[in-house]
Amino acid sequence: MASLSVSSSSTIIDSRAPPSRLASASASSPSCISLPTLPIQSHTRAAKATAYCRKIVRNVVTRATTEVGEAPATTTEAETTELPEIVKTAQEAWEKVDDKYAIGSLAFAGVVALWGSAGMISAIDRLPLVPGVLELVGIGYTGWFTYKNLVFKPDREALFEKVKSTYKDILGSS
């Protein structure tokens, strides 16, 4: 009569492990390690967890509703917050725009260009000698601009007039 036995433990065979002293006659046989089996998951445990979650949901729902005989709270005063003037102006300007798709596309392109230029500046800043040279160029240009446009009163007034006229050209005379 033949009998069949099934082992429920897992076995790992490590062929690189050195043979143990207690190994049988053949020294080249691989080492075997047995691992314990995992405990069997009971279905009642999952059912208990589901029931507990349903109980929590039921409690949350009952807490969200009003009690019997209790009237819901109503406010007699309507609380309104005024929008800042710049938001109102922006909303009015957006309503006047005919081609909103083009404006949205330009805004998206501007964000992408800003992101790309920030990456390019970051890459240039990592170069060894370039940041120091660019800083010197910036200091020199700032000094030249200050001397040419801001030191003397007639030059300063001419600069202010040029800025105001450019501002009117961009936004239109209103």
From Swiss-Prot:
Subcellular locations according to the entry: Plastid, Chloroplast thylakoid membrane
Main location as per UniProt: plastid
Region span, Disordered: 1-20
Segments crossing the lipid bilayer: 101-121, 127-147
Membrane topology (UniProt): Multi-pass membrane protein
GO MF terms held by the record: DNA binding; protein domain specific binding
Keywords assigned: Acetylation, Chloroplast, Membrane, Phosphoprotein, Plastid, Thylakoid, Transit peptide, Transmembrane, Transmembrane helix
InterPro entries listed in its UniProt record: CAAD_dom (IPR025564), CURT1 (IPR033344)
Domain of life: Eukaryota
Sequence ranges on the Stromal membrane side: 64-100, 148-174
Lumenal topological segments: 122-126
Keyword Nucleotide-binding: no
Subunit relationships: Homo- and heterodimers and trimers. Interacts with PSAL.
Function of the protein: Determines thylakoid architecture by inducing membrane curvature.
Family from the record: Belongs to the CURT family.
Protein's UniProt name: Protein CURVATURE THYLAKOID 1B, chloroplastic
Organism: Arabidopsis thaliana
Gene that encodes the chain: CURT1B
